[in-house]
């Protein structure tokens, strides 16, 4: 709008009219000084400054059918078919944005040259139909933004990229209770004063390095076995992490092979105890075999009994079927009057 006013000096508004003419002013109608003379009590309206006095008016054919004392602004020659240009945003003197250089105001031109001038201006500003002009403001770097953070006020814009959120707290690490008993530490300190301290100092580090890849939530049963842990490649294996406590447990608990060897007792086959045990086992085996034979005999006897009963029932069914057939034949041979009298009875 400022550019249009600068191009056409006749568009400058006159001093504010009295309240009677405010309704006409809303409709963008402007009145000349001689029209407002009556409103100021017969006195001429205050004249505009020499720099803002209107030039020669264009003929009435260009502005359309309007009154003698009225002038309307026809924006049709100023508008491009593609759309009106957007006014650049006002630059603020803050530390957040860099003020863009103000565009030079164009010199006034005649009404016949407005269309060519605007088309050239739009082509320079927007770079053609399919090109968009970049924004006329820049953003401050991170260092400058941090230095000027205290000078920001609520009206300033916030940076595009918000600060990254704080990292989540590490998950709770849960280890097996009694993984490193106190007696093991005592044996290490008593056995090797120099080397035991180094192993005791290195073992917690290995345990922590291994536990870093096995974080379990509180309340779940966490274990350090290879089946439940999923460690990425390049991490210490569970066997390496458990090597020091295995050596420590060797004195406290025997190995599985030792347990098996202790479970097997050396028995002399020529002793009386061995003979008595063998006799008891033989007697138990004979009893179990005799019981199995008795069960087989009882089963066979029961099968024979059921087979005989089945044959007897089949014979009885055959006999009853024969009797039924004879009775049917008898009823068929009886005369009908006898059957009718027997039915009334």
From Swiss-Prot:
Glycans are attached at residues 227-228. The modification Asymmetric dimethylarginine is found at residue 3. Expressed at low levels in the lung, kidney and spleen. The modification N6-methylated lysine is found at residue 43. The keyword Acetylation applies. Induction: By ER stress. Residues 275-295 are annotated as: Basic motif. Residues 84-100, 218-232 have a biased composition (Low complexity). InterPro entries: bZIP, bZIP_sf, C/EBP, C/EBP_chordates. A motif (9aaTAD) lies at residues 116-124. Residues 46-67, 79-116, 157-178, 218-271 are annotated as: Disordered. GO terms for biological process: acute-phase response; brown fat cell differentiation; cellular response to amino acid stimulus; cellular response to interleukin-1; cellular response to lipopolysaccharide; defense response to bacterium; embryonic placenta development; granuloma formation. One of its GO terms (molecular function) is histone deacetylase binding. The modification Phosphothreonine is found at residues 226, 235, 266. Its main location: nucleus. Residues 47-59, 160-171 have a biased composition (Pro residues). Residues 297-304 are annotated as: Leucine-zipper. There is a cross-link at residues 133, 174, 185, 187, 260, 262, 332 (Glycyl lysine isopeptide (Lys-Gly) (interchain with G-Cter in SUMO2)). Methylated. Methylation at Arg-3 by CARM1 and at Lys-43 by EHMT2 inhibit transactivation activity. Methylation is probably inhibited by phosphorylation at Thr-235. There is a cross-link at residue 174 (Glycyl lysine isopeptide (Lys-Gly) (interchain with G-Cter in SUMO)). Important transcription factor regulating the expression of genes involved in immune and inflammatory responses. Also plays a significant role in adipogenesis, as well as in the gluconeogenic pathway, liver regeneration, and hematopoiesis. The consensus recognition site is 5'-T[TG]NNGNAA[TG]-3'. Its functional capacity is governed by protein interactions and post-translational protein modifications. During early embryogenesis, plays essential and redundant roles with CEBPA. Binds DNA as a homodimer and as a heterodimer. Interacts with ATF4. Binds DNA as a heterodimer with ATF4. Interacts with MYB; within the complex, MYB and CEBPB bind to different promoter regions. Can form stable heterodimers with CEBPD. Can form stable heterodimers with CEBPA and CEBPE. Interacts with SIX1. Isoform 2 and isoform 3 also form heterodimers. Interacts with TRIM28 and PTGES2. Interacts with PRDM16. Interacts with CCDC85B. Forms a complex with THOC5. Interacts with ZNF638; this interaction increases transcriptional activation. This is CCAAT/enhancer-binding protein beta. It comes from Homo sapiens (Human). The gene is CEBPB.
